[in-house]
UniProtKB/Swiss-Prot annotation:
The chain crosses the membrane at residues 17-37. Its main location: plastid. It is a single-pass membrane protein. This is Photosystem II reaction center protein L. Keywords: Chloroplast, Membrane, Photosynthesis, Photosystem II, Plastid, Reaction center, Thylakoid, Transmembrane, Transmembrane helix. It comes from Oenothera argillicola (Appalachian evening primrose). GO terms for cellular component: chloroplast thylakoid membrane; photosystem II reaction center.
Length: 38
């Protein structure tokens, strides 16, 4: 039980970091597209 909990937490951290990275890339893409089109 105690050994599986840290592993699950690591997976959750990896997923959250991945989603934050995708969100950051999406925001940067929108900002760059607005900058170039304007």
């Amino acid at each position: 039980m105690t050994q599986s909990n840290p592993n699950e937490q690591d997976v959750e951290l990896n997923r959250t970091s991945l989603y934050w990275g995708l969100l950051l890339i999406f925001v940067l893409a929108v900002l760059f597209s607005n900058y170039f089109f304007n």
